[in-house]
Curated annotation (Swiss-Prot):
Pfam families: Folliculin, Folliculin_C. The gene is Flcn. It comes from Mus musculus (Mouse). Residues 493-558 form the dDENN FLCN/SMCR8-type domain. InterPro entries: FLCN/SMCR8_DENN, FLCN_DENN_C_sf, Folliculin, Folliculin/SMCR8_longin, Folliculin_DENN. Residues 31-82, 294-323 are annotated as: Disordered. Its main location: membrane. Gene3D superfamilies: 3.40.50.12430, Folliculin. Residues 86-242 form the uDENN FLCN/SMCR8-type domain. Residues 339-491 form the cDENN FLCN/SMCR8-type domain. The modification Phosphoserine is found at residues 62, 73, 302, 406, 537, 542, 571. This is Folliculin.
């Protein structure tokens, strides 16, 4: 967790002061924090707790080193600090903990070494012990802003027989720049920090009771003459927290507690990437996979039943193997889930547009988007496979029905992408139909008849492509909106192929959302035509080509989505809400 935990104290002589703070370091340690220690000067006490290796380093400094370190420190000068304002001795390099799991270091000093962090901690300390306090001056509170960070502060009192009111004022603060994370960590921080405070108060109370038993101070103070001038009682108005708790290892224990607090608080909340609801393409693919699994299970069951029946083999049938013919449904599902191999041919839509030419590509793309049958006739099976692989990216998965290569013509209701060998005849009424486009691939007589000068691929330069249709798309026809946007993306050379692919995905999602709205409006709610026209105008799809595209894409909606809509509308709760 990227935060700073600090212990603050309100000194009677100097006001709010930071006593001890622990910060998280993801980068190498700063100079002066446990660096340059020789074996003779360093005492290391290491222990394992919660996956953190605790290391406390103490070294003896010469007076010159102490003076230089004091002048370079962003904290207050020695002359501005009393015993109650100081935690670590002069020259103490602080405490360091190494987290072996994450390679993170937790470093504790009296003040942060970075000037900006020192300013943030200093301001939070002053506010926590002056204006930002809860009623009763003891308890948790939250404050902060985007510039100076957000602070969780818990103020508390420590018993002191020599202090005014027999107690001194402290606070433990946790500073973060992430407001939401800090608020969500409030229950955890509150429970753990209260545990630390209770332990400190229990130790101080034992010392307080011992001092009161040995030399009661209340009667002595009541008998003392009143004076308007501030003065030190018994010559020791400022006492350190170690003397108040009688614990010489107090700062090492606080470092351990603060380091564990930072590690545990950062581990309990993690960020997860939420991908949202599955798209229609994902739902359709899942349905097709489920259908294939069902079909394979049915085939396995039928084979098992045939084996149990154990039919007697008739004479003359030996040596012959009978194979079952796949049903039409299995054939269609196999066509829908067909995955072509990655072979040479068309690389992308931009590649195909450059090879076919802009007019021919626009005609072909228009028929693809409208749901018309696209027939490729070529002897090169790999070329047909690559063409279908590229063209199918313009359609939702549910609208794609492919027969990659057939020895006979297949009707349009069975497939909208059909690959044929050149000798296969196509019926005359199909060739004259406005709902069919045919791409014939011939061998070019000269290599420069139809060069494929794109993407350094000359494998298509030996072919000549002829695109024909019974209803050619006029050059001045507006066409569907998505086709114009696709062409604009393909002609923009500043966009790479990967960017164009992502743009195509976004366009399909945009228009599939319009399809869902139209399906709900017309099929589920059964609205009149006048309302449907108004809806199409709102969706920006009132043109004829856009309407045809929406109706075709409606066939690609998943069964899951359709059944969910129908069950929601027909449920009693939905009926009551509509009424």
């Amino acid at each position: 967790m990227n935060a700073i935990v600090a212990l603050c104290h309100f000194c009677e002589l100097h006001g709010p002061r930071t006593l001890f703070c622990t910060e998280v370091l993801h980068a190498p340690l700063p100079q002066g924090a446990g660096s340059g220690d020789s074996p003779d000067q360093v005492e290391q006490a290491e222990e394992e707790e919660g996956g953190i290796q605790m290391s406390s380093r103490v070294r003896a400094h010469s007076p010159a080193e102490g003076a230089s370190s004091e002048s370079s420190s962003p904290g207050p000068k020695k002359s501005d600090m009393c015993e109650g304002c100081r935690s670590l001795a002069v020259g103490h390099p602080g405490y360091i903990s190494h987290d072996k799991e994450t390679s993170i270091k937790y470093v504790s000093h009296q003040h942060p070494n970075h000037p900006q962090l020192f300013s943030i901690v200093r301001q939070a300390c002053v506010r926590s012990l002056s204006c930002e306090v809860c009623p009763g001056r003891e308890g948790p509170i939250f404050f902060g802003d985007e510039q100076h960070g957000f602070v969780f502060s818990h103020t508390f009192f420590i018993k002191d027989s020599l202090a005014r009111g027999f107690q001194r004022w402290y606070s433990i603060i946790a500073i973060m720049m992430d407001r939401i994370y800090l608020i969500n960590s409030w229950p955890f921080l509150l429970g753990r920090i209260r545990g630390i405070i209770s332990e400190l108060q229990a130790k101080a109370f034992k010392v307080f009771e011992a001092e009161q038993f040995g030399c009661p101070q209340r009667a002595q103070r009541m008998n003392t003459a009143f004076t308007p001038f501030l003065h030190q009682r018994n010559g020791n108005a400022a006492r350190s927290l170690t003397s108040l708790t009688s614990d010489d290892n107090l700062w090492a224990c606080l470092h351990t507690s603060f380091a564990w607090l930072l590690k545990a608080c950062g581990s309990r909340l993690t960020e997860k990437l939420l991908e949202g609801a599955p798209t229609e393409d994902t739902l359709v693919q899942m349905e097709k996979l489920a259908d294939l699994e069902e079909e394979s299970e049915s085939w396995d069951n039928s084979e098992a039943e045939e084996e149990e029946k154990a039919p007697v083999t008739p004479e003359g049938a030996e040596g012959r193997e009978l194979t079952s013919c796949p049903t039409e449904s299995s054939f269609l599902s196999a066509c829908g889930s067909w995955q072509p191999p990655k072979l040479t041919g068309f690389k992308s839509l931009r590649h195909m547009r450059q090879v076919l030419g802009a007019p021919s590509f626009r005609m072909l793309a228009w028929h693809v988007l409208m749901g018309n049958q696209v027939i490729w006739k070529s002897r090169d099976v790999n070329l047909v496979h690559s063409a279908f692989e590229v063209l199918r990216t313009m359609l939702p998965v549910g609208c794609v029905r492919i027969i990659p290569y057939s020895s006979q013509y297949e009707e349009a209701y069975r497939c909208n992408f059909l690959g044929l060998s050149p000798p296969v005849p196509i019926p005359a009424h199909v060739l004259a139909s406005e709902f069919v486009v045919v791409v014939e691939v011939h061998t070019a007589t000269r290599s420069n008849l139809h060069p494929a000068g794109c993407e350094d691929d000359q494998s298509l330069s030996k072919y000549e492509f002829v695109v024909t249709s019974g209803s050619p798309v006029a050059a001045d026809r507006v066409g569907p909106t998505i086709l114009n946007k696709i062409e604009a993306a393909l002609t923009n050379q500043n966009l790479s192929v990967d960017v164009v692919d992502q743009c195509l995905i976004c366009l399909k999602e945009e228009w599939m959302n319009k399809v869902k709205v139209l399906f709900k409006f017309t099929k589920v709610d059964s609205r009149p035509k006048e309302d449907t026209q108004k809806l199409l105008s709102v969706l920006g799809a009132s043109e004829e080509d856009n309407v045809k595209l929406l109706k075709f894409w409606m066939t690609g909606l998943s069964k899951t989505y359709k059944s969910h809509l129908m069950s929601t509308v027909r449920s009693p709760t939905a009926t009551e809400s509509r009424s």
